[in-house]
Amino acid sequence: MKCFTGLVGAFTPEEVIFMLYMADRTRLREKGYDTLRSKRYYMENMEMGSRIFDKCVEKTTRMGLLERVPVSGMYDYLWHMDSYNRLVGILAELGNPFSTRAFCHRMFDVEKRTVASVSDEEVSQWKERHR
């Protein structure tokens, strides 16, 4: 799984780890692996506590990147690669780490938007104003 370096400037280290881990789980699922695991399993593999894990789940779900599906008393976490690839494209377009951090904070923390709701025009306008 490749890491897009723009994620590092735009999100917290825990959020980046969470995103990369979930994207990798999706890759494994697509290859036919059973990826249903307990919350404890995920937390141990990402070396994060319950509170941080839950915050990452909440934020990425709100962003339209993650879907929690109840299965056998656990949750299966489905990562939406189309939305993730769109996010990577937005970050690549913005380029500047300071600009990407401010943009992501505004769009996803303050306005609580989904990745899919962010238009190319908004990205271009932000880039123009925050050179």
Predicted regions mapped to residue ranges:
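Short recognition helix of helix-turn-helix/winged-helix DNA-binding domains
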Residues: M1-E44, M74, V88-A102
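Alpha-helical hairpin
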Residues: A10-F11, M48, V118
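Winged helix-turn-helix DNA-binding recognition segment
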Residues: R25-R86
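Charged low-complexity intrinsically disordered patches
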Residues: E58, R62, D82-R131
